[in-house]
């Protein structure tokens, strides 16, 4: 019997995640929490369910596994059988057995690991597959979880987004208009905030297409099925370096005028002047809103996060004097008001043609 196992991320409420999985695991006969993992049994399509859970926030990793007996001989044979099928020539494999506290067995994990590894080493000698000394040194992990009544030998392991359960911290409003804002939204979502509403500002058609692709990627990353988009054309009343801050300022004004009281800003001390960050935070608080800046204290980490998210991050520190921006105060307010008047609200289902649906709707 094949089952799907979801392993919660480090700070995820396991019971809440089990309930969340139960809601999405349609066609699954049983979803139960077993110590530090969630077992989904008798799924209509285990591959599809595993794929779905691998995009779910709050899940650290997902496995498709064979449900077998906890009997020492039977379990060892099951691990060897799975290993023989999934270990490729030349790979270094590591057999890892996790015995849950509720399990009732008369052996320790090392006993099973040693027995299965030894048998596999002999069986796979002809293809030069060798056991690794540690999990870190291995190119192939064979994981087995021993529960209260059954053991589960993992056939396939997949990483998942991690973070907290989507929406567990309430709703926020954010915009996606460049790589930094994309990372900001993604970080907020992984922290458990519900980013169902996304402001999509754009200066021209080219920028609209770029930003729409980022919105599509965001939806795919967090496994969303439906997204509300507020498409807003904007005009930046300047060129050059100062336009970067002006654009951010106009967008911040737009966000403050929207209904949601929690706003996510893509501000970071690595790029934006401190005085600029302080001004936006102060204005947001004065407007009765709560500002969030997930990237505020990040610098070198931004590049790594962008690579993990699958985007390019081409940013550098913006050096603009405070007085230079002050002269655009009236223009910023005027452009923000004008942009809001031309807002187009889109309610679209996420699918393979999502990008084109966004462009065509605007």
Spans of features found by a protein language model:
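Non-catalytic substrate-recognition/targeting regions of SAM-dependent transferases
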Residues: 67-165
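Non-catalytic nucleic-acid substrate-recognition regions in nucleic-acid-modifying enzymes
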Residues: 9-102
């Amino acid at each position: 019997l094949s089952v799907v196992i979801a392993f919660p991320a480090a700070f995820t409420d396991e019971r809440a995640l089990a309930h969340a999985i139960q809601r999405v695991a349609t066609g699954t006969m049983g979803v139960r929490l077993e110590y530090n993992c969630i077992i989904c049994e008798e799924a209509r399509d285990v591959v599809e369910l595993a794929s779905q859970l691998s995009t779910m926030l709050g899940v650290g990793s997902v496995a498709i596994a064979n449900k077998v007996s906890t009997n020492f001989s039977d379990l060892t044979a099951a691990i060897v059988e799975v290993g023989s099928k999934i270990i490729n020539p030349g790979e270094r494999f590591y057999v890892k057995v996790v015995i849950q506290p509720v399990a009732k067995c008369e052996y320790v994990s090392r006993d099973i690991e040693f027995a299965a590894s030894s048998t596999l080493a002999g069986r796979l000698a002809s293809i030069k597959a060798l056991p690794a000394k540690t999990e870190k040194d291995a190119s192939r992990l064979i994981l087995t979880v021993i529960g209260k009544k059954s053991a589960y030998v993992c056939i396939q392991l997949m990483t998942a987004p991690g973070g907290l359960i989507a929406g567990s911290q309430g709703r926020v409003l954010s915009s996606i208009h460049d790589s930094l804002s994309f990372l900001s939204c993604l970080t907020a979502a992984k922290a458990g905030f519900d980013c169902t509403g996304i402001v999509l500002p754009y200066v021209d058609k080219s920028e609209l297409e770029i930003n729409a692709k980022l919105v599509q990627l965001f939806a795919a990353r967090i496994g969303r099925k439906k997204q509300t988009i507020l498409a807003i054309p904007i005009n930046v009343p300047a060129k050059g370096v100062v336009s970067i801050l002006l654009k951010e300022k106009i967008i911040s004004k737009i966000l403050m005028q929207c209904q949601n009281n929690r706003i996510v800003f893509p501000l970071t001390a690595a790029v934006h002047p401190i005085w600029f960050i302080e001004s936006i935070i102060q204005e947001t608080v004065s407007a009765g809103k709560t500002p969030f800046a997930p990237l505020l204290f990040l610098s070198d980490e931004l590049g790594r996060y962008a690579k993990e998210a699958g985007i390019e991050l081409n940013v550098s520190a913006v050096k603009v004097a405070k007085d230079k921006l002050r002269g655009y105060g009236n223009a910023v307010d005027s452009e923000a008001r004008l942009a809001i008047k031309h807002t187009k609200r889109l309610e679209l289902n996420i699918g393979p043609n999502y990008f084109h649906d966004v462009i065509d709707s605007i």
